Amino acid sequence: MRRTRRPRFVLMNKMDDLNLHYRFLNWRRRIREIREVRAFRYQERFKHILVDGDTLSYHGNSGEVGCYVASRPLTKDSNYFEVSIVDSGVRGTIAVGLVPQYYSLDHQPGWLPDSVAYHADDGKLYNGRAKGRQFGSKCNSGDRIGCGIEPVSFDVQTAQIFFTKNGKRVGSTIMPMSPDGLFPAVGMHSLGEEVRLHLNAELGREDDSVMMVDSYEDEWGRLHDVRVCGTLLEYLGKGKSIVDVGLAQARHPLSTRSHYFEVEIVDPGEKCYIALGLARKDYPKNRHPGWSRGSVAYHADDGKIFHGSGVGDPFEPRCYKGDIMGCGIMFPRDYILDSEGDSDDSCDTVILSPTARAARNVRNVMYLHQEGEEEEEEEEEEEDGEEIEPEHEGRKVVVFFTRNGKIIGKKDAVVPSGGFFPTIGMLSCGEKVKVDLHPLSG
């Protein structure tokens, strides 16, 4: 029997298929190896730093440098990042800048070659050496430090690096672009330091809106763990205990010419621990409005009013997202004006803002008619080292509160020396409010 000879081209095709199969397996293995290398390559690195989401806090012994390096470098499409200082700690030795990928974590950013950083404690720029040059102002809790690379730098491989403070450019410097890119870095060097990292931050254009933001910032006399962005206030504190209060106090007290203000709850955050009220000028920054002497406030989370005490009285329903809380003063006709030159010439006609136009009964409540109304006696807590200010008949007023344009209640109070300042407190993460310090006109 004659054997049939298998065609040669069939054997060749099978060999080609086998080679293709092995090439495919090698290709898959190579892809897996590349992914593993990239996964290892793009990992955030840190030492003596505790990382909790986007929050970084110092976690070393005194004298040890803490350093954090982000997992990916800045790019042409993502060329800017920011760091918000939550707590400046003991010395405020916080550094923000750019470093090579494998930068030594035992040194502050900017101390070693091919790195640059803006240091908060002295306002100096450190560019590859342990000695800095004067660059900008010092930074404290509540400040934001930004760092970026001009987009054109990615085409010429020479990095033009700029820094910002609270959204405003401080200055710039030039350094060679590292082959692997320049990575966002944060350094810390003392106990208690804590920051919030914003790797996807965007730098707004410096136009008329920035000038408007500046004018709004000027309206605030004190800001603690609160960020101002136009009319918006954002809580920046830890929100972990009752002393982590974020406080915003207006620069000027309420007067017969400006006796009312409003707050809209934009974001209630985790707990809606938002308080609106009035307080003396030297009110403690770590006490919620209403908790300590010389203050009275309406709290959104429980609908209670607090008047110089940590125990509140039932007042009205709670407030939620979108609600507008208001606070004002009804002045008696015989009110004794402070030396600020307050006058009641323009206060006979009061018109509410559109958001509270339904509250027509607020229109003429600036003056309190004294017709035998009984004054409630409020017991005020005496804080350590402070004396209760004696009541003065000519400085007794009625503080009133509104909810969505309607008066919901009143509280008798004595105006402290210097006046009652609009004060807003926040105490849980994510809280944001929109403030109108001058909702009335006329």
From Swiss-Prot:
Amino acid composition bias (Acidic residues), ranges on this chain: 372-390
InterPro entries per UniProt: B30.2/SPRY, B30.2/SPRY_sf, ConA-like_dom_sf, SPRY_dom, SPRYD3_SPRY, Ubq-SigPath_Reg
B30.2/SPRY domain residues: 17-204
PROSITE patterns, per the entry: B302_SPRY
Region Disordered, annotated ranges: 371-394
Disulfide cysteine pairs (residue numbers): none
Any single Pfam family the record assigns to this protein: SPRY
Protein name: SPRY domain-containing protein 3
Native organism: Pongo abelii
